[in-house]
């Protein structure tokens, strides 16, 4: 009997182990539901370049992404092509997905459809219900429509998308407590033909941006549900762009708190000063990243003692509710007064500061003691709030945000300002500029994003991604995209390709070109590397071919460069392209400039280059590998991108390389002052001329002949 029990126990244990393994290896099925934008209309090789296809690459093997998009479809069941009447809709239900991404509403704005607008809410709700009733109990996530840049409303109407569809999707998310991802601002507020060639459908590059934003959201690791904050019986709910908000009071003071649907570890939060709901895009994006957004009213107090006391009480309340001990402070305009005055009193409680056109000196605003007009009414209110007995006392006061620079620098608080350079209300020269100068003197520079020609309004950035990245970096929560292997999505013939070629066809041609060869040299990189030309038939611009043929000989070398590639794209190609089929004696890698141009910093770019080199060591075990990092960019030594370039090479120079020889090529192309030598670069000071390729070819020859 005991033996039988023991056998049953062992069998049960084995079963449970097998079950746990299979459960842990369960593929997460993602259904992308939508219209032509989901389908990938107008995108060359849409099977690999539509947003669902690129999302699959981005999410990796733990996910299975399927495209159920149908061009022209509507959420309206009374529309001219209802999604619920398509075969794809039935297939998406039969798929029993774990996650459903719904992106509909654009075609509903056509005149023949929007005449039924009163049915939109209920018809969209019925679509949501259909997925929520599935046996797989999927996460249903609503995607707001992307912005449309069409010029009129004869068909799809941009104004209706912005003013009616977008808010309705947010309302549905709020009512159903559904996760929501804001795509509306992703492509900015002015048309970019690279991202949306026909002003309606994203290109492969635009689809890649969609995939990255959605992918970053889906790859967040949900934390265990925490106890909801105790906000009191009088708290009332409100809709904050699809998220769950609550109005409540502390000691009779109006407060607000908006909760994310997926809470980030540690319960990070933002305390916003003044102008609740104005330019909310940063707050919405941080909610998507798991941050709570909070507000405690300090209106008409101008950062005075009473304002500081209110925030002290609010901070204590949030700490008792289990929120992070360090808060993100966000202030626009006069909100800068309370942000900096509170931070100076509580530097150890501040994670970072994002200030937008902030008032840093009462003399500038509201007193108007400089170039700005100031505000007479606000000056009178400010004098009362501070209990100043006279205007002269206020002018002599030494408790302005500018006066806190030394304290804030000592605390090493990360600080970002976003300013309009033509601000006539809170002039940059009287507020941010002197503060920036002081912080630099105290060895803690701040970051300033300038908006040329912009006045005091509009605040923020239309696409807040740089602000969000700054906040995440302060918490150490940024993911380095430079080291994440994904295919590229370049598609333009201006990339130096024959018409009709796109990234995947170029990548496939490289693989074919390397078959059955034994090369002396294989060059890996981006458009600069592509410019060597080699024997690739789809490449139309090859200024370096004659130079390399001259120094090495014909047919003994090849280029595997692709225009537009960043480190993550080359990493993908090396990992999956089987480039070692050409048995190269030497491999030379030059990559990273596109990372810097697209906003990656020097540190992240360096990590990407190192990841590429490490993968090359694995894939080319019998080759000598040379890493050039990236060629210098920008004409002058003090070019902003060159400064990040230098940071990249500083890190590469310090790195302890294994199986790789690192060479900094800066001196190949620059003079004694660090400026690019005449004639070596084209007018963009990114790409080489024939003379520049001649210099590079001779230097590379020296490298591979050295022992």
For each of these PLM feature ranges, what is it?
Residues 26-32, 37-125, 485-614, 634-646:
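Conserved SGNH/GDSL esterase-like catalytic core that processes O-acyl groups on lipids
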Residues 43, 146-223, 632-707:
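Catalytic His-Asp segment of secreted/periplasmic serine-dependent ester chemistry enzymes
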Residues 72, 300-301, 450-459, 564:
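Histidine-bearing beta->alpha loop at or near hydrolase active sites
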Residues 81-82, 341-391:
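Hydrolase active-site cap/lid region
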Residues 200, 204, 219, 425, ...:
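C-terminal catalytic histidine-bearing segment of alpha/beta-hydrolase fold enzymes
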Residues 302-322, 341, 608:
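Alpha/beta-hydrolase active-site loop
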Residues 322-333:
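Alpha/beta-hydrolase fold nucleophile elbow
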Residues 374-433, 437-440:
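The feature captures the conserved acid-bearing segment of alpha/beta-hydrolase catalytic domains
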